A protein has these predicted regions:
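Predominantly a Rossmann-like dinucleotide-binding segment in NAD(P)-dependent oxidoreductases
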Residues: 80-85, 90-185
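Short glycine/threonine-rich loop-to-helix capping motif typified by GTGT followed
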Residues: 185-191
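Glycine-rich phosphate/pyrophosphate-binding beta-alpha loops
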Residues: 181, 207-214
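Active-site beta-strand termini and strand-to-loop segments that position acidic
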Residues: 195-199
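N-terminal glycine-/serine-/threonine-rich beta1-alpha1-beta2 phosphate-ribose binding loop
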Residues: 1-59, 65-83
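Conserved small/polar residues in nucleotide/adenosyl-binding loops
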Residues: 222-226
Length: 226
């Protein structure tokens, strides 16, 4: 564990028990559940080890670095019977829960399109005290640790389409590039995707981190937009 983070945590909770690594947490019989909020590439091993240790888990989004990791984690959850939550913000937001209740009740009619955005105006960087900590602290910018905008931001919006329509898309097309923040990062600073469902309804996702004009989600009906 990064010592400055431990020091800051102890300022907030001086009596809290401190662990040097996650294995120590899993070995503690007094711990029933853990929260995984590490860089994305570290999720899989921690989650799988936690299941083996009999812990319940709240894992931050996105669940895994690859689809295979996500599949194996889900199967492990099923086989162990341990509770597994993922940190998709909208699943816990009363506004979205209410909106979905109304959508599923047919209050507004049939959905004919969904448009989602997550735009920001900033380089997504954090200051580093030493150059050798660059990839560790700014892990979101490097493919070794991150999938970029799709796993850090898009996952929230993409959930909306499947939640509202209660099904998964059948086709997807997309494009990404580094067009503004040419600072050595490896992940795209803008992406655009189109998801097509079996009835022809389309959901778009756009994200750019050099302009913050649009956001967040729009569900389109014939006579209104939610």
């Amino acid at each position: 564990i990064y010592q400055p983070s431990i020091d800051e945590a102890l300022k907030l909770a001086p009596k809290a028990k401190v662990y040097g690594n996650y294995q120590e947490v899993l070995e503690d019989k007094n711990v029933d559940a853990i929260l995984v909020a590490t860089p994305l590439s570290a999720h899989y091993k921690i989650v799988m080890d936690a299941f083996d240790a009999g812990k319940h888990i709240f894992c931050e989004k996105s669940i895994g670095y690859t689809m295979e990791e996500c599949y194996h984690m889900y199967q492990k959850h099923r086989s162990t019977g341990r509770i597994f939550f993922t940190g998709q913000q909208r699943l816990f937001d009363p506004r979205y829960i209410k909106a979905m209740e109304m959508i599923h009740a047919g209050t507004f009619g049939e959905i004919n399109g969904i448009h989602t955005f997550w735009n920001r105006n900033g380089d997504w960087r954090r200051s580093v005290p030493s150059p050798n900590l660059e990839r560790l602290i700014n892990w979101r910018l490097y493919k070794e640790f991150s999938k970029g905008l799709m796993t850090e931001l898009a996952c929230h919006q993409l959930q909306i389409g499947s939640w509202a329509l209660r099904k998964l898309p059948e086709k997807v097309m997309g494009h990404g590039a580094i067009t503004y923040w040419k600072d050595g990062r490896e992940v795209y600073d803008n992406v655009s995707c189109i998801y097509v469902f079996d009835d022809g309804v389309k959901m778009t996702f756009d994200s750019i981190i050099s302009n913050k004009f649009y956001g967040l989600e729009a569900v389109s009906y014939t006579h209104l937009t939610l």
